[in-house]
A protein has these predicted regions:
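Juxtamembrane interface at the cytosolic side of transmembrane helices
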Residues: 201-243
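Membrane-embedded alpha-helical segments in integral membrane proteins
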Residues: 181-191, 214-217, 243-253
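Alpha-helical transmembrane segments of integral membrane proteins, especially early/N-terminal helices
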Residues: 162, 168-171, 227-236, 299
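Soluble extramembrane regions of membrane proteins in the secretory/endomembrane system
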Residues: 1-192
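Juxtamembrane/start-of-transmembrane alpha-helix segments at the extracytoplasmic/lumenal side
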Residues: 188-202
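Alpha-helical transmembrane segments of integral membrane proteins
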Residues: 238-302
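Short juxtamembrane and helix-loop transition motifs at transmembrane-helix boundaries
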Residues: 74, 79, 222-228, 254-259
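Contiguous hydrophobic segments
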Residues: 153, 232-234, 248
């Protein structure tokens, strides 16, 4: 969905000698247009993403006329690329990372590799279920199914020590992809790889600890004296979990065009209202006294 997440993979493939193309889906990354449509139906947002993908595929295949072409998608995009590749027989392979899709068929699309992180047990189980649904008996990770001559290879495997996001930054993922292309093309492209994931992690940790350090230079305020019973705290949490879904199922305000963002905004507003009316009136003064606006502004900007 977002070009920034796919950068390590794209760089690794480019270093191996392949032309790579990254793009942002509607409503993702730097794409100027929002996505729209019902996210719970195939005919809604999914179909619009598929149409967008098909347009990009057609453009670049026509522009470069490659002898080999492959599409890669992660998470939500894994379903999109499987559907799109099934409609584009000129694609030689599709790679679904952290896959969750029901669109895969026995011979469509061509040559499919499914990769999940080791720490994604549900998606790993789902991927084996996908193979079962297309007629593979007792499927195993790391084993090839189908015939290369028929362009119907199917393989599910996992990336060691990786989760839903880490799988995109893992050097092992990069190596798997280069090895997969070499296998399909009977080629021997050299794998170089990159450690963008490690440097990204160092950057985030540095920003995190630097932020903690900078808060020490902000004005301090003494904490108020609160009297908040455990039972009240317990019931507020129960109400905040149960009530918002019941309200938002029947009534929501439209603040933005993004369905997921709009839902989160409504959810936060409802929870804030619940918390506001759950506080004892005598505590509002203490909350106001201890509110640290500079700290709030600093965290908000971050």
């Amino acid at each position: 969905g977002s070009t920034s997440f796919m950068r390590p993979i794209a760089v690794a493939l480019a270093e191996a000698g392949y032309l790579t193309v990254r793009f942002d889906f509607f409503g993702h990354g730097r794409h100027p247009l929002p996505y729209s449509g019902d996210i719970t139906t195939i005919e809604g947002a999914t179909q619009k993403f598929v149409n967008q993908t098909n347009e990009i595929i057609s453009h670049y295949l026509l522009k470069h006329s490659p002898s080999f072409s492959m599409i890669i998608g992660h998470s939500m995009a894994s379903d999109i690329i499987i559907r799109s590749a099934s409609m584009n027989p000129s694609l030689n392979s599709a790679v679904a990372i952290s896959a969750y899709t029901d669109a895969l068929k026995a011979k469509e699309p061509k040559n499919v590799l499914i990769l999940n992180g080791q720490w994604e047990p549900q998606l790993r189980s789902k991927s084996l279920e996908i193979l079962q649904n297309i007629g593979v008996d007792n499927p195993k990770e790391g084993k090839l199914y189908g015939a290369l001559d028929d362009n119907a290879i199917r393989k599910v495997d996992f990336i060691k020590n990786a989760d839903h996001v880490g799988v995109l930054y893992s050097v092992r993922t990069q190596r798997e992809l280069v090895d997969w292309i070499n296998f399909l093309e009977k080629d021997k492209q050299i794998f170089i790889g990159n450690n963008i994931g490690i440097w990204t992690g160092i950057l985030f940790f540095s920003i995190f600890f630097l932020s903690i350090l900078l808060t020490k230079f902000l004005p301090k305020k003494s904490l108020g004296k609160y009297q908040f019973g455990y039972m009240r705290f317990f019931f507020i949490n129960i109400i905040a979990c149960v009530l918002p879904p019941l309200i938002l199922y029947n009534f929501t305000f439209k603040f933005v065009n993004f369905p997921a963002h709009n839902h989160l905004i409504n959810q936060m507003i409802v929870i804030s209202i619940i918390l506001f009316f759950s506080l004892p009136p005598t505590q509002f003064k203490e909350l106001t006294k201890s509110f640290n606006f500079p700290l709030f502004a600093f965290l908000f900007i971050l």
